[in-house]
Amino acid sequence: MEAIINSRIVTKETVLTGHVLVYDESGIQQIVSTDNFQAGKCRVITDGSGYIAVPGFINEHIHGLGGVDVMDDDPQALAIMAKRLPETGVTAFLPTTMTYDLPSITRALTRIRRYMKEQRIGAKVLGAHMEGPFISDIYKGAQKSTHIVKADFSLIEPFIDTVRIVTLAPETLPDNSFLEACKKAGIIVSVGHSAATYEKLAERLAGLDHYHVTHLYNAQSPLHHRKPGVVGAALTDERAVCELICDDVHLHPAAQRLAYIAKGRNGIILITDSIRACLTENGESELGGQKVFVHENRAELADGTLAGSVLTMADGVRRFMHNTGASLPEAVAAASLNVAVSLGLDHQLGSLEVGKAADIVLLDEDTLQVKKTIIDGTTVFSA
């Protein structure tokens, strides 16, 4: 077994001091007071002075980083992402496809399924997030209109063992049969790239127990006092769990705070929506066959349309706390536990508890920068 001593430990509800985190490859074995810690049973003891121990982050919406993209026709792309993500505190993720030609989406989902069976090291792939191609042309964002198609569950059915989330525009559906098929298959419906009215969403989503909202505020009908739109529905429907890109580019700090006040600690999931340019230098990049220009923390198409982000999860957690006043346990839960709960994996992932996977991140207590990442009890990144 191994142990982390002298760190603060973030649990679901509080931050512990004077405790030791004991773990091995099979999971977290103990969270015990320093006075009761038996050091002789541990082969490695890490001094966590100046660090905060948090559960590994789970990123449910990420297109790429480190120069690669989920849509790349490259069998090594996912392995590269899995290897680099621990640098950002991510220990599990959903590779996210985008609105592309159907053969390319099929190939990407096939690669994801194969990788899930073969993966050995790095961040865990928990399944796929399909962002499109069943979206609205009005709010397509950085996705190509020519690749948008009508929703057809037969396109997803061969991959129901892989797809965990599908982003779509509900107003483009002729009826609720597609949504019912997703519910039956255990696939989370996420409203995004949608021009739906508040009333149309209420009609279409009536049969769902819960749903997600893809990057709240972005690429969807906005909140107006007479036309609440997707944003109004998301903020007022208790079933809705909302993704937020907290890079202060996609969302004004006040918009982040509004979401936090409306949705509470359980209704927000922090994401990055990052593209291949994340963890690379400023300059020209690519997304979905389109040129992207990156400067500092902003990624845009030539016409100024935001094109994903270059945000990391650790930075998103820091900004979310600063902008909303959320506590450290609340911000950490938004980047870990809330995702695990939605995916039905909170018995294994999402919080530091005895019996759960030893997916642990040590953050600098002053800057929240990632200093060490542990996956299944093995250190995979150390700054």
Model-derived regions, located:
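N-terminal metal-binding scaffold of metallo-dependent hydrolase/deaminase domains
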Residues: 1-39, 374, 378
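C-terminal cap of metal-dependent C-N hydrolases
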Residues: 7, 341, 351-383
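Alpha-helical scaffold segments that flank or form the walls of functional sites
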Residues: 51-53, 60, 70-123, 146-159, ...
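Divalent metal-dependent hydrolysis catalytic cores, especially in the metallo-beta-lactamase
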Residues: 63, 79-108, 123-136, 160-171, ...
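Active-site gating loops and adjacent loop-to-helix segments of metal-dependent hydrolytic enzymes
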Residues: 83-94, 137-160, 203-220, 227-241, ...
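Active-site core of metal-dependent hydrolases
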Residues: 159-280, 380
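His/Asp/Glu-enriched, well-ordered alpha-helical/loop segment
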Residues: 229-242, 260-272, 278-356, 360-363
